[in-house]
Amino acid sequence: MLPTLDIQFPLPAGTVLPDYGTNGLYGLASSLRHWLHDRDAAWLPGEVSAGERAVVILLIVDGLGDRFLDTVGQGSALHGARRQTLTSVCPSTTASAVTTLMTGVPPAVHGLNGWFIHDHRFGGVIAPLPLMQRCGPALEAFRLLPRLCPTPPMFHHACRPVNLVSPADIAFSRFSRHHARGAHIEPYKGLEDFGAAIVAMADALAGSGGLIHAYYPTFDALSHTYGCRSAEAGVCFARVDKLFVRLQRALAGRDVRILVTADHGFTDAAPSRCVDIAPESEVARMLAAPLFGERRLAFCKLRQGAEADFEAWAAVELAGKAVAVTGEAFLASGLLGPGVPHPRLRERIGSYALLMEPGWTIVDHVAGETAHEMIGVHGGLSADEMLVPLILART
């Protein structure tokens, strides 16, 4: 039976709900996990037959949305090889989606429901990927990662070899090493080195078959800084498209499966469409902690007794800008996916979820924190953010 959602509240205009069946990133990751752990399994997304010793490359281009591919990417090699449109998970963000692509479980289970999460054991609002408090020091605690992220990576105890091709600046971070258990880590610097590392790892797996999990973050970084339809993002896409062609040529005749997908897409947000919670404002005094989650889908923890005042504020100040949903209703909706929930999930959702309308963001401020201005954003439920391509080439 396919997982179903139970939405008992209004949704932002144009919402695309996450698909936790065969038409979403979770289904792709879950089936990949099964293939890695069963020598006799087939893997339909990669056209891998049962028992076949295939070399599979899963190339994740951070931020490459399906809507972008359909417009800016029209006529590209990547566009021509697209097989399917998938949904991201909720929230449509790297911390949630890439962790799903490394574990094979949805955000409800792995527990990373945004760039920032709330976990009082480690100081309140924290960023789990860099393992920092929000505008605070690096996290240090006994058995930090096993407690924070107890779900094992899909590579752990896999019966097929796995090589992770990862940017050198994050390849051996604490978060990366924790989620790479069972795999070989191959760091790279720059796009040319990225391609060379992928080919070298494919050569290493030629006899045994296995997975090359390759991650490229630059498109995402440029889209945040310059906008998702900027010239800079377009140039980066063109370079990735050329890499896709080069990989097919370098691996020609070997029936390597090259799959390309993304963790999420992008939308641009103007500064004039930002709900800015000023320090010491009426609503700031209702909050028991800084916002967490994403600026396109935020979670908030209220002070005890502030619920009625917050709802009254939201009814006026968020009208046409966001949908405020109680934490209980958001959890029950299934938007974070099926499965046994992470033991801290209820805390990580907070008192309310704020689902931003198209083009809107919400931010707050922490003393000493440097504001990060972003033109391109993601995390929300719009089609631009939620839809990602599944691209396949067989060499």
Region locations from a protein language model:
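TRNA-binding/sensing appendages of the translation machinery
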Residues: 49-79
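Metal-dependent active-site segment of extracytoplasmic phospho-/sulfohydrolases and closely related
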Residues: 57-58, 239-278
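A short, conserved beta-to-alpha structural element at the edge of catalytic cores
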Residues: 80-100, 284-304, 370
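Active-site neighborhoods of enzymes that stabilize oxyanions during catalysis
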Residues: 289-395
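His/Asp/Glu-rich, glycine-adjacent segments
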Residues: 1-41, 74-82, 87-210, 215-225
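A long, amphipathic alpha-helix that forms part
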Residues: 192, 199, 219-256
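Generic beta-sheet signal
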Residues: 54-57, 208-218, 256-258, 352-354
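Catalytic metal-binding/acid-base residues of hydrolase active sites
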Residues: 64, 229, 264-265
